[in-house]
UniProtKB/Swiss-Prot annotation:
Signal sequence region: none
Record flagged with keyword Cytoplasm: yes
EC nos: 3.1.1.-
Organism: Salmonella choleraesuis (strain SC-B67)
Protein name, UniProt field: Acetyl esterase
InterPro entries associated with the record: AB_hydrolase_3, AB_hydrolase_fold, Acetyl_esterase, GDXG_lipolytic_enzyme, Lipase_GDXG_put_SER_AS
GO cellular component: cytoplasm
Length: 323
């Protein structure tokens, strides 16, 4: 699609979102567009420090969990001594960027709002690790904590997955993997999904939205996909194109959140409509005036905090619902 035909989203953003877009961190160099992937990862970590400041204080513990691919680092956030459930969090970053530190504030707020232990999983990044390694690492982490719950003072009778962007895909894919492979790590009561991609190759929103402001042009999305997948055939895998999986049965309750001007919004809409059509429990909420990745900006955007609290409320409601 000719770029000039796209919707001029920057003129339609909320005032809060505009403030974030126009915010300049003092001393922050420009994005290293020509840098190698490691340079870009270090920049992303540096740029996110401001947005992760002033987060709630709580007990944390780092644990290296053995998986078939080697140890994976996890971080446990415990807002209180006892917990009614355990929530596993998968960070976004296009499969190639991000770690536990870039999403620290998000996980702390989720732990605070749910009152539950949140476990962040520092899965291996692409292109060094290809599909389905991150999913298999996530499943291995869940299995480990299910078997060692007492050692970490965890309640794994009820568990959930949560994630943003690529992490949302990994969260839902991991849940479907557990179901399809008949692996039990606890009663999976809910999945919290913020502006994920779920397998569409093209859509109206991908044509109308996306640009330098969000790093989600068609070329960007192709780059993330090529870094993550092993080959073209993986595009149709039911744990990558999740619409090729069976979404008509036994899908845990899903909270599906989207950003109004996100090129990936149609992925969320289609997921919601598919689950709804087959009576799978779900809730969809679109946050007006926002761009992809707005969840990071709760220091300046009340709507980002609202989106986290909405997901937390959904999770807490499922904790009280027999399943």
């Amino acid at each position: 699609m000719k770029p000039e035909n796209k919707i001029p989203v920057l003129t339609r953003l909320s005032d809060e979102m505009k403030a974030v877009v126009n915010f300049q961190q003092p001393g922050l160099p420009p994005w290293p567009a020509d840098g190698d992937i490691e340079t870009q990862r270090q920049y992303y970590l540096l740029e996110r420090r401001f947005w992760n400041a002033d987060a709630p204080s709580m007990t944390t513990r780092t644990c290296a969990v053995p998986t078939p691919y080697g140890d994976v680092t996890t971080r446990l956030y415990s807002p209180q001594p006892t917990s009614q459930a355990t929530l596993y969090y998968l960070h976004g970053g296009g499969f190639i960027l991000g770690n536990l530190d870039t999403h620290d504030r998000i996980m702390r707020l989720l732990a605070r709002y749910t009152g539950c232990t949140v476990i962040g999983i520092d899965y291996s990044l692409s292109p060094q690790a290809r599909y389905p390694q991150a999913i298999e690492e996530t499943v291995a982490v869940c299995s480990y904590f299910s078997q060692h719950a007492d050692e970490y003072s965890l309640n794994v009778e009820k568990i959930g997955f949560a994630g943003d962007s690529a992490g949302a895909m990994l969260a839902l894919a991991s849940a479907l993997w557990l179901r399809d492979k008949h692996i039990r790590c606890g009663n999976l009561i809910a999945i919290l999904l913020w502006y994920g991609l779920y397998g569409l190759q093209d859509s109206v929103s991908r044509r109308l939205f996306g640009g330098a402001w969000d790093g989600l042009t068609r070329e960007d999305l192709d780059m993330y996909e090529k870094a993550y997948l092993r080959n073209d055939e993986d595009r149709e895998s039911p744990w990558y194109c999740l619409f090729n999986n069976d979404l008509t049965r036994d899908v845990p309750p899903c909270f599906i959140a989207s950003a109004e001007f996100d090129p990936l919004i149609d992925d969320s809409r289609l997921l919601h409509q598919t689950l709804q059509a087959h009576q799978q429990p779900c809730e969809y909420k679109m946050y007006p005036g926002t761009l992809h990745a707005f969840l990071h900006y709760s220091r300046m955007m009340t709507i980002a905090d609202d989106a986290l609290q909405d997901g937390a409320r959904f999770f807490m409601a499922r904790m009280k619902t027999p399943r």
